[in-house]
Amino acid sequence: MSKYNVLIVGSGGREHALAWKVKQSQHVQNVFVAPGNAGTGMDATNVDLDPADHDAVIQFAKENNVGLVIVGPEAPLVAGLVDALTDAGLRAFGPSKAASELEGSKVFCKNLLRSADIPTADYRTFRSADDASRYIKDRFSEPTDPVNVVVKADGLAAGKGVVVCDTRSEALEAIDRIAARKEFGAAGKELIIEERLTGPEVSVLAITDGETIVTLPPAQDHKPANDGDTGPNTGGMGAYCPAPVLDEETLAKVESSILVPVVHAMKRSRRPFKGVLYAGLMLTPAGPKVLEFNVRFGDPECQPLLMRLKTDLVEVMQAVVDGKLEETGPLEFDPRPAICVVMASEGYPADYEKGHAITGIESADKMENVKVFHAGTQRVDGEVVNTGGRVLGVTAMGDSISAAKLQAYKAVREIRWQGAWCRKDISDKALVTADKA
C-alpha cells in the first residue's frame, strides 16, 4: 500500500500527541498540523490554516495528497468540519456535526441520556437567568444553605463552563456569570442545574465506527487548578493512564450500561457516531454515572494514553472511517503506566501572561521515557515562547505509577519560563488507590 499524508487539525497538546503517534505509522509519509504549535513544528509540518475556514482546509488537503484528516478539538467538530471534508470526497476521522451535539450541547446530551435510561445526575434546564435563580431561591431559602448543585453552560466553554457550588450565593453567582453576564457567550443561552454527585472521577474513552466499540484503558484527569482538587476548573492540569480506581469488572459495566447504549441511542436519533467517544464519569456509591460526554480525545488524557499505545493508530482510524472496526484486533498497550503533568502560564485559568521564552525542553525530552508535548507554544525569533494558558504536557512512563510520577516531575524541573507553574500532586489519587489494593 502506498504511503499518504495526514493532516491533523488543532494546536493543543492533544494534537501534538496525535502528530507524534501518527508519524510512527507505516502508512504515513508526511504529517501536517493546522495551525499547530512549536512542538508540532518539530515533529511534523505546521500549516498556517484557520480550522474555521473549511474551504481552505479542503483545498490544502486536496493539493497535498492528504489521505486522512484527523480533527482534534471539539470546536471544529461541532462546526461541521468533518461533514465538509466528507462532502468534498476527503477521508476524515471524527464525528459529524449532528453527532458532535453530544458535546456541543449539554442539554442535548442530558436529554439523550435520560431517554436511553443511562445513569446520570438529576437535572433541570433553564433558558433564562431569572428562572434559574428563582429555582435556586425556592429550593434553598437561606443564603448560607448548603446547596450541592452544579451549574453548567449548555455550549462549549473550553472546559470552564461548569461551576460546582457549595452555597446558594455561589449558585446564584454562577447563574449570573453564565446566563446574565454571558461570560461564555452563546454557550450560556441555556443552562443546566444538576445534583452534585460524589465519588472519584474517571475518564473512559472508546473508539467507534457507529457499530463496533473499542474501549480504551481508563484515565484520570485533574480539572481543578490547585493541589488537592481545589480552586477553579481548568481544561485539565494533568492525567494518568491507566486509572486503578476503575477495575476490569466496573469497566465492563461502563461499556455495557453507558457506552453501548449511547452509540445505539445516537444511531436511533439518526446521528450515527464515528470517532472517539469520551465519557466523563463519577464512580458514585450507586455505580458509575455520566458527568459529561466529549466527542474527541481528552486533553491531557490523550498524552499518557497515546504514549502507551503500541498499535498503529492510523490503521485504527482508517477502520473507523471505512466502518470496519470489527476487523481490527484488540489494541496493544505498553503495560507501564504513564502520567502527564501540565505546566501552565502565570494567572491561568484567568488572564495569564504570555510571550516568555521557555528553556530546558530539549534536556527534558532527552530523559528516558519522557516526551514533552506542546500546547500553548510558538516559535518566535528562534525561541519557544508561551502563548496559551496550558503550555506543556510533560509526559513520562514508568514501571509503576510512582516511578512515572517521579520521572515526569524530574523532567518538569528541567523546564523554566517566567511564571511557570503546575500542580504537584498529579497521580497521587492513583497511589492512594494502589496502596489500598
Curated annotation (Swiss-Prot):
Residues holding Mg(2+): 292, 294
Keyword field: ATP-binding, Ligase, Magnesium, Manganese, Metal-binding, Nucleotide-binding, Purine biosynthesis
Keyword flag Magnesium: yes
Residue ranges constituting the ATP-grasp domain according to the UniProt record: 110-322
Catalyses which reaction(s): 5-phospho-beta-D-ribosylamine + glycine + ATP = N(1)-(5-phospho-beta-D-ribosyl)glycinamide + ADP + phosphate + H(+)
Entry note: cofactor: Binds 1 Mg(2+) or Mn(2+) ion per subunit.
EC number: 6.3.4.13
Pathway field: Purine metabolism; IMP biosynthesis via de novo pathway; N(1)-(5-phospho-D-ribosyl)glycinamide from 5-phospho-alpha-D-ribose 1-diphosphate: step 2/2
An example Gene Ontology molecular-function term: metal ion binding
Residue positions binding ATP: 142-203
GO biological process, one term: purine nucleobase biosynthetic process
Required cofactor names: Mg(2+); Mn(2+)
Family, per entry: Belongs to the GARS family.
Record protein name field: Phosphoribosylamine--glycine ligase
Protein species of origin: Rhodopirellula baltica (strain DSM 10527 / NCIMB 13988 / SH1)
Gene from which this protein is expressed: purD
